[in-house]
Amino acid sequence: MGKIDFRLEKTFGYTTGACAAAGAYSALYFLKNNERLNFVEIVNLKEDSLIIPIKNIEKQGDTAISTVEKFSGEDIDITNGMDIEIEVTLNLDNNSSESSNVDIIGGIGVGIITKSGLQVTLGKPAINPKPREMIETNLKSLLTDNECVTVKISVPNGDEIAKKTLNPKLGIIGGISILGTTGIVRPMSNDAYKESLAPQIDVALANNFENLIFVPGNIGTKHAKILLHAEEDQIIEVSNFWDYMLNKAKEKGVKDITVFGHAGKIVKLAGGIFDTHSKVADARNEILCAYTSLVTQDVEILQKILQSNTTEDIVEILTEKGILKEVFDNVSKRVVERLSSRWDGINFSCIIINMKGNMLGKYDQG
Protein backbone atom coordinates (compact mmCIF):
# COMPACT_ATOMS: atom_id res chain seq x y z
CA MET A 1 0.00 0.00 0.00
CA GLY A 2 2.99 2.32 0.47
CA LYS A 3 2.17 5.10 2.93
CA ILE A 4 -0.98 6.17 4.77
CA ASP A 5 -1.06 9.48 6.63
CA PHE A 6 -3.78 9.12 9.24
CA ARG A 7 -3.66 12.85 10.00
CA LEU A 8 -5.46 13.25 6.67
CA GLU A 9 -6.91 9.81 5.93
CA LYS A 10 -10.54 9.35 6.98
CA THR A 11 -11.46 6.20 5.04
CA PHE A 12 -8.96 3.71 6.44
CA GLY A 13 -8.37 3.30 10.15
CA TYR A 14 -5.63 1.80 12.31
CA THR A 15 -5.78 -1.19 14.64
CA THR A 16 -5.20 -1.43 18.38
CA GLY A 17 -1.87 -3.06 17.53
CA ALA A 18 -0.85 -0.07 15.40
CA CYS A 19 -1.88 2.26 18.25
CA ALA A 20 0.39 0.35 20.61
CA ALA A 21 3.33 0.41 18.19
CA ALA A 22 2.93 4.14 17.50
CA GLY A 23 2.60 4.98 21.18
CA ALA A 24 5.61 2.86 22.13
CA TYR A 25 7.74 4.49 19.44
CA SER A 26 6.77 8.04 20.48
CA ALA A 27 7.40 7.29 24.16
CA LEU A 28 10.84 5.79 23.54
CA TYR A 29 11.75 8.62 21.17
CA PHE A 30 10.83 11.12 23.90
CA LEU A 31 13.00 9.31 26.44
CA LYS A 32 16.02 9.28 24.15
CA ASN A 33 15.68 12.67 22.46
CA ASN A 34 13.62 14.73 24.94
CA GLU A 35 11.30 15.69 22.09
CA ARG A 36 7.52 15.29 22.06
CA LEU A 37 6.22 14.08 18.71
CA ASN A 38 2.72 15.02 17.58
CA PHE A 39 2.77 12.11 15.16
CA VAL A 40 5.03 9.18 14.34
CA GLU A 41 5.79 7.23 11.20
CA ILE A 42 5.99 3.51 11.85
CA VAL A 43 6.13 0.51 9.53
CA ASN A 44 3.87 -2.51 9.56
CA LEU A 45 5.02 -6.06 8.85
CA LYS A 46 4.43 -5.55 5.13
CA GLU A 47 6.75 -2.52 5.27
CA ASP A 48 3.95 -0.03 4.63
CA SER A 49 4.46 3.32 6.36
CA LEU A 50 1.72 4.44 8.76
CA ILE A 51 1.69 8.02 10.02
CA ILE A 52 -0.32 8.02 13.26
CA PRO A 53 -1.20 11.02 15.49
CA ILE A 54 -0.12 11.05 19.13
CA LYS A 55 -2.76 12.44 21.48
CA ASN A 56 -0.56 13.07 24.50
CA ILE A 57 2.84 12.19 25.96
CA GLU A 58 4.37 12.69 29.41
CA LYS A 59 7.69 11.73 31.03
CA GLN A 60 8.49 10.61 34.56
CA GLY A 61 12.20 9.88 35.01
CA ASP A 62 13.18 6.94 32.81
CA THR A 63 9.53 6.27 31.90
CA ALA A 64 7.34 7.95 29.28
CA ILE A 65 3.60 7.45 28.78
CA SER A 66 2.08 8.04 25.36
CA THR A 67 -1.64 8.10 24.56
CA VAL A 68 -3.00 7.19 21.13
CA GLU A 69 -6.67 7.48 20.21
CA LYS A 70 -8.01 4.48 18.29
CA PHE A 71 -9.43 5.42 14.88
CA SER A 72 -11.49 2.92 12.91
CA GLY A 73 -11.99 4.92 9.70
CA GLU A 74 -15.31 4.27 8.00
CA ASP A 75 -15.64 0.92 9.82
CA ILE A 76 -16.88 2.44 13.08
CA ASP A 77 -16.74 -0.14 15.87
CA ILE A 78 -16.86 -0.32 19.64
CA THR A 79 -13.14 0.53 19.93
CA ASN A 80 -13.33 3.73 17.86
CA GLY A 81 -12.26 6.77 19.87
CA MET A 82 -10.94 4.88 22.89
CA ASP A 83 -7.57 5.81 24.36
CA ILE A 84 -4.69 3.35 24.44
CA GLU A 85 -1.91 4.24 26.88
CA ILE A 86 1.58 2.92 26.29
CA GLU A 87 4.12 3.19 29.09
CA VAL A 88 7.76 2.69 28.09
CA THR A 89 10.58 2.28 30.60
CA LEU A 90 14.18 2.41 29.34
CA ASN A 91 16.90 0.36 31.01
CA LEU A 92 20.49 1.11 30.03
CA ASP A 93 21.81 -2.23 31.33
CA ASN A 94 20.53 -5.06 29.17
CA ASN A 95 21.32 -8.18 31.18
CA SER A 96 18.19 -9.98 30.03
CA SER A 97 18.52 -13.60 29.02
CA GLU A 98 15.55 -13.12 26.69
CA SER A 99 16.22 -13.13 22.95
CA SER A 100 14.46 -9.76 22.60
CA ASN A 101 15.39 -6.52 24.32
CA VAL A 102 11.74 -5.44 24.17
CA ASP A 103 9.50 -6.79 26.95
CA ILE A 104 5.79 -6.24 26.27
CA ILE A 105 3.26 -6.59 29.09
CA GLY A 106 -0.42 -5.86 29.60
CA GLY A 107 -1.83 -3.29 31.98
CA ILE A 108 -5.32 -2.32 33.09
CA GLY A 109 -7.98 -2.86 30.43
CA VAL A 110 -6.05 -5.44 28.41
CA GLY A 111 -7.66 -8.87 28.70
CA ILE A 112 -6.10 -12.05 30.08
CA ILE A 113 -6.33 -15.37 28.21
CA THR A 114 -8.20 -18.02 30.22
CA LYS A 115 -9.07 -20.58 27.50
CA SER A 116 -6.90 -22.73 25.26
CA GLY A 117 -6.96 -22.53 21.48
CA LEU A 118 -6.08 -18.87 20.95
CA GLN A 119 -2.87 -17.37 19.58
CA VAL A 120 -1.70 -16.35 23.05
CA THR A 121 -0.64 -18.65 25.93
CA LEU A 122 -3.00 -19.22 28.86
CA GLY A 123 -2.61 -16.62 31.59
CA LYS A 124 -0.91 -14.09 29.32
CA PRO A 125 -2.27 -10.68 28.25
CA ALA A 126 -4.29 -10.66 25.03
CA ILE A 127 -1.61 -9.04 22.89
CA ASN A 128 -1.44 -11.02 19.67
CA PRO A 129 1.86 -12.08 18.03
CA LYS A 130 1.69 -9.72 15.04
CA PRO A 131 1.22 -6.54 17.13
CA ARG A 132 4.07 -7.70 19.38
CA GLU A 133 6.29 -8.14 16.34
CA MET A 134 5.31 -4.72 14.99
CA ILE A 135 6.14 -3.05 18.31
CA GLU A 136 9.53 -4.80 18.50
CA THR A 137 10.40 -4.00 14.88
CA ASN A 138 9.77 -0.29 15.29
CA LEU A 139 11.48 0.08 18.68
CA LYS A 140 14.67 -1.73 17.67
CA SER A 141 15.56 1.11 15.32
CA LEU A 142 15.85 3.36 18.40
CA LEU A 143 17.68 0.94 20.72
CA THR A 144 21.37 0.22 21.09
CA ASP A 145 22.66 -3.24 21.97
CA ASN A 146 22.99 -2.45 25.68
CA GLU A 147 19.50 -1.00 26.02
CA CYS A 148 16.23 -2.75 26.77
CA VAL A 149 12.72 -1.49 27.30
CA THR A 150 9.55 -2.58 29.02
CA VAL A 151 6.38 -1.67 27.15
CA LYS A 152 3.15 -1.71 29.17
CA ILE A 153 -0.11 -1.37 27.23
CA SER A 154 -3.22 -0.18 29.09
CA VAL A 155 -6.74 0.71 27.98
CA PRO A 156 -8.80 2.92 30.31
CA ASN A 157 -12.34 1.46 30.49
CA GLY A 158 -11.10 -1.53 28.49
CA ASP A 159 -12.92 -3.92 30.82
CA GLU A 160 -16.26 -2.23 30.09
CA ILE A 161 -15.62 -1.97 26.35
CA ALA A 162 -14.70 -5.67 26.21
CA LYS A 163 -18.13 -6.67 27.55
CA LYS A 164 -19.57 -5.50 24.22
CA THR A 165 -17.23 -7.76 22.24
CA LEU A 166 -16.76 -11.53 21.87
CA ASN A 167 -13.88 -11.51 24.37
CA PRO A 168 -15.85 -12.91 27.34
CA LYS A 169 -17.10 -15.83 25.20
CA LEU A 170 -13.55 -16.51 24.01
CA GLY A 171 -12.28 -16.57 27.58
CA ILE A 172 -10.47 -13.24 27.35
CA ILE A 173 -11.26 -11.69 30.71
CA GLY A 174 -10.92 -8.16 32.04
CA GLY A 175 -10.28 -6.16 28.91
CA ILE A 176 -9.88 -5.88 25.16
CA SER A 177 -7.38 -7.55 22.86
CA ILE A 178 -4.49 -5.87 21.07
CA LEU A 179 -4.97 -7.04 17.50
CA GLY A 180 -4.15 -6.47 13.85
CA THR A 181 -2.00 -8.19 11.26
CA THR A 182 -1.30 -5.17 9.02
CA GLY A 183 -2.15 -2.33 11.40
CA ILE A 184 -4.75 -1.09 8.91
CA VAL A 185 -8.53 -1.19 9.24
CA ARG A 186 -9.99 -1.33 5.74
CA PRO A 187 -13.42 0.27 5.19
CA MET A 188 -16.59 -1.77 4.75
CA SER A 189 -14.64 -5.01 4.51
CA ASN A 190 -15.85 -6.59 7.79
CA ASP A 191 -12.40 -8.20 7.92
CA ALA A 192 -11.71 -7.25 11.52
CA TYR A 193 -15.09 -8.53 12.69
CA LYS A 194 -14.75 -11.80 10.79
CA GLU A 195 -11.29 -12.34 12.27
CA SER A 196 -12.73 -11.84 15.75
CA LEU A 197 -15.28 -14.63 15.13
CA ALA A 198 -12.88 -17.32 13.87
CA PRO A 199 -11.07 -17.98 17.21
CA GLN A 200 -14.31 -19.47 18.59
CA ILE A 201 -13.58 -22.53 16.44
CA ASP A 202 -10.07 -22.83 17.91
CA VAL A 203 -11.44 -22.68 21.45
CA ALA A 204 -14.06 -25.35 20.68
CA LEU A 205 -11.49 -27.70 19.16
CA ALA A 206 -9.06 -27.12 22.03
CA ASN A 207 -11.84 -28.26 24.36
CA ASN A 208 -12.27 -31.46 22.28
CA PHE A 209 -15.78 -30.77 21.00
CA GLU A 210 -16.43 -32.95 17.95
CA ASN A 211 -19.83 -31.51 17.05
CA LEU A 212 -19.90 -27.72 16.76
CA ILE A 213 -23.16 -25.78 16.79
CA PHE A 214 -23.16 -22.86 14.35
CA VAL A 215 -25.69 -20.14 15.23
CA PRO A 216 -26.34 -16.68 13.77
CA GLY A 217 -26.21 -14.89 17.14
CA ASN A 218 -27.67 -14.44 20.62
CA ILE A 219 -31.05 -16.07 19.96
CA GLY A 220 -29.39 -19.22 18.68
CA THR A 221 -26.90 -19.29 21.54
CA LYS A 222 -29.61 -18.92 24.18
CA HIS A 223 -31.85 -21.65 22.81
CA ALA A 224 -29.05 -24.07 21.85
CA LYS A 225 -28.13 -24.20 25.53
CA ILE A 226 -31.74 -24.98 26.45
CA LEU A 227 -32.86 -27.23 23.59
CA LEU A 228 -29.60 -29.03 22.82
CA HIS A 229 -27.97 -28.75 26.27
CA ALA A 230 -24.99 -27.29 24.44
CA GLU A 231 -21.98 -25.93 26.30
CA GLU A 232 -20.81 -22.34 25.79
CA ASP A 233 -17.57 -23.24 24.01
CA GLN A 234 -19.38 -25.66 21.69
CA ILE A 235 -21.51 -22.86 20.23
CA ILE A 236 -20.03 -20.81 17.38
CA GLU A 237 -21.66 -17.45 16.62
CA VAL A 238 -21.18 -16.72 12.91
CA SER A 239 -23.18 -13.48 12.62
CA ASN A 240 -23.97 -13.18 8.88
CA PHE A 241 -20.71 -14.71 7.68
CA TRP A 242 -21.58 -18.35 6.99
CA ASP A 243 -19.31 -18.60 3.97
CA TYR A 244 -16.28 -17.28 5.87
CA MET A 245 -16.88 -19.31 9.03
CA LEU A 246 -17.59 -22.57 7.21
CA ASN A 247 -14.41 -22.11 5.18
CA LYS A 248 -12.53 -21.65 8.46
CA ALA A 249 -14.18 -24.73 9.93
CA LYS A 250 -13.09 -26.85 6.98
CA GLU A 251 -9.54 -25.43 7.12
CA LYS A 252 -9.33 -26.37 10.81
CA GLY A 253 -10.59 -29.92 10.25
CA VAL A 254 -14.08 -29.68 11.75
CA LYS A 255 -16.05 -32.82 10.81
CA ASP A 256 -19.50 -32.32 12.32
CA ILE A 257 -21.64 -29.16 12.40
CA THR A 258 -25.20 -28.54 13.55
CA VAL A 259 -26.73 -25.42 12.00
CA PHE A 260 -29.13 -24.02 14.58
CA GLY A 261 -31.09 -20.81 14.69
CA HIS A 262 -34.07 -18.64 13.99
CA ALA A 263 -35.91 -19.20 10.72
CA GLY A 264 -35.31 -15.63 9.55
CA LYS A 265 -31.61 -16.33 9.09
CA ILE A 266 -31.42 -20.08 8.47
CA VAL A 267 -33.99 -20.07 5.65
CA LYS A 268 -31.61 -17.97 3.55
CA LEU A 269 -29.07 -20.81 3.57
CA ALA A 270 -31.60 -23.00 1.76
CA GLY A 271 -31.47 -20.47 -1.06
CA GLY A 272 -27.69 -20.58 -1.25
CA ILE A 273 -27.29 -17.21 0.48
CA PHE A 274 -24.18 -17.56 2.65
CA ASP A 275 -23.88 -13.90 3.67
CA THR A 276 -27.21 -13.44 5.41
CA HIS A 277 -27.08 -9.65 5.94
CA SER A 278 -30.24 -8.01 4.61
CA LYS A 279 -28.19 -5.63 2.46
CA VAL A 280 -26.78 -8.62 0.56
CA ALA A 281 -29.97 -10.60 -0.06
CA ASP A 282 -33.28 -11.46 1.52
CA ALA A 283 -35.61 -13.85 -0.38
CA ARG A 284 -36.97 -15.40 2.85
CA ASN A 285 -40.57 -15.05 1.69
CA GLU A 286 -39.76 -16.39 -1.76
CA ILE A 287 -37.88 -19.40 -0.39
CA LEU A 288 -40.64 -20.27 2.06
CA CYS A 289 -43.26 -19.76 -0.63
CA ALA A 290 -41.42 -22.21 -2.90
CA TYR A 291 -41.22 -24.89 -0.20
CA THR A 292 -44.83 -24.34 0.83
CA SER A 293 -45.87 -24.87 -2.79
CA LEU A 294 -44.44 -28.40 -2.58
CA VAL A 295 -47.00 -29.14 0.14
CA THR A 296 -50.03 -27.11 -0.94
CA GLN A 297 -51.17 -25.40 -4.11
CA ASP A 298 -53.48 -23.05 -2.20
CA VAL A 299 -52.81 -19.77 -4.03
CA GLU A 300 -54.26 -17.66 -1.23
CA ILE A 301 -51.79 -19.16 1.26
CA LEU A 302 -48.87 -18.65 -1.12
CA GLN A 303 -49.84 -15.01 -1.70
CA LYS A 304 -50.06 -14.39 2.05
CA ILE A 305 -46.56 -15.80 2.48
CA LEU A 306 -45.14 -13.55 -0.24
CA GLN A 307 -46.79 -10.50 1.32
CA SER A 308 -45.82 -11.27 4.93
CA ASN A 309 -43.75 -8.74 6.86
CA THR A 310 -41.82 -11.22 8.98
CA THR A 311 -40.85 -14.87 9.12
CA GLU A 312 -42.85 -15.18 12.34
CA ASP A 313 -45.97 -14.15 10.39
CA ILE A 314 -45.27 -16.97 7.91
CA VAL A 315 -44.88 -19.42 10.80
CA GLU A 316 -48.39 -18.48 11.97
CA ILE A 317 -49.81 -18.98 8.46
CA LEU A 318 -48.22 -22.43 8.13
CA THR A 319 -49.33 -23.39 11.64
CA GLU A 320 -52.95 -22.51 10.87
CA LYS A 321 -52.74 -24.56 7.67
CA GLY A 322 -51.26 -27.52 9.58
CA ILE A 323 -48.17 -27.83 7.36
CA LEU A 324 -45.54 -26.07 9.47
CA LYS A 325 -43.35 -29.07 10.28
CA GLU A 326 -43.43 -30.50 6.77
CA VAL A 327 -42.37 -27.21 5.20
CA PHE A 328 -39.55 -26.54 7.65
CA ASP A 329 -38.30 -30.13 7.58
CA ASN A 330 -37.92 -29.72 3.82
CA VAL A 331 -36.18 -26.37 4.24
CA SER A 332 -33.82 -27.92 6.81
CA LYS A 333 -33.03 -30.74 4.40
CA ARG A 334 -32.23 -28.25 1.66
CA VAL A 335 -29.92 -26.31 4.00
CA VAL A 336 -27.98 -29.51 4.66
CA GLU A 337 -27.84 -30.32 0.93
CA ARG A 338 -26.57 -26.84 0.09
CA LEU A 339 -23.86 -26.89 2.75
CA SER A 340 -22.79 -30.47 2.05
CA SER A 341 -22.31 -29.80 -1.66
CA ARG A 342 -20.10 -26.79 -0.94
CA TRP A 343 -18.23 -27.96 2.15
CA ASP A 344 -17.77 -31.66 1.49
CA GLY A 345 -16.21 -33.74 4.22
CA ILE A 346 -18.31 -32.13 6.95
CA ASN A 347 -21.38 -33.90 8.33
CA PHE A 348 -24.17 -31.32 8.61
CA SER A 349 -27.49 -31.28 10.42
CA CYS A 350 -29.97 -28.42 10.70
CA ILE A 351 -32.50 -27.31 13.30
CA ILE A 352 -34.74 -24.29 12.71
CA ILE A 353 -36.51 -22.54 15.60
CA ASN A 354 -38.84 -19.59 16.17
CA MET A 355 -38.17 -16.61 18.44
CA LYS A 356 -39.42 -18.53 21.48
CA GLY A 357 -37.03 -21.41 20.83
CA ASN A 358 -39.68 -23.85 19.62
CA MET A 359 -38.45 -26.26 16.95
CA LEU A 360 -40.03 -25.67 13.54
CA GLY A 361 -38.15 -28.26 11.51
CA LYS A 362 -34.98 -30.33 11.39
CA TYR A 363 -32.90 -32.60 9.22
CA ASP A 364 -29.98 -34.86 10.10
CA GLN A 365 -27.76 -36.45 7.47
CA GLY A 366 -27.37 -39.38 9.80
Swiss-Prot record:
Keywords: Cobalamin biosynthesis, Methyltransferase, S-adenosyl-L-methionine, Transferase
One of the record's GO molecular function terms: cobalt-precorrin-5B C1-methyltransferase activity
A Pfam family it matches: CbiD
Catalytic activity of the protein: Co-precorrin-5B + S-adenosyl-L-methionine = Co-precorrin-6A + S-adenosyl-L-homocysteine
EC number: 2.1.1.195
EC class name: transferase
Pathway the protein acts in: Cofactor biosynthesis; adenosylcobalamin biosynthesis; cob(II)yrinate a,c-diamide from sirohydrochlorin (anaerobic route): step 6/10
InterPro entries named in the record: CbiD, CbiD_sf
BP term (GO), one: anaerobic cobalamin biosynthetic process
NCBIfam families: cbiD
Similarity-based family: Belongs to the CbiD family.
Family annotation (PANTHER family): COBALT-PRECORRIN-5B C(1)-METHYLTRANSFERASE
Protein name in the entry: Cobalt-precorrin-5B C(1)-methyltransferase
Provenance organism: Methanococcus maripaludis (strain C7 / ATCC BAA-1331)
Recorded name of the encoding gene: cbiD
